[in-house]
């Protein structure tokens, strides 16, 4: 897995390269992004747990006061798993020789949007 800075640079570069959806390594890049996002979500969960723990246990009162943070963590974990599943989907279709232009565009748009939001801010409602 690439270091966070390296992955951030690759994702940011991909956002500016309109032809990147044709990259034959797109599925691998999405799988890498999914792994990095899952690692980030794991770090965020550990950090939040440490912040909310009192005496080695998560405090209900602290949890009540951190609803925005826990909601954000849930969204981050959801986006991370979505990237993993998108990467798996693309790999499966590639093995079956069914990964065409439409699938590549779906992958590029979906993964690109999730990566952009992970890096720039996840909108919550």
Locate each region found by the language model.
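Flavin-dependent oxidoreductase catalytic core characteristic
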Residues: 1-125
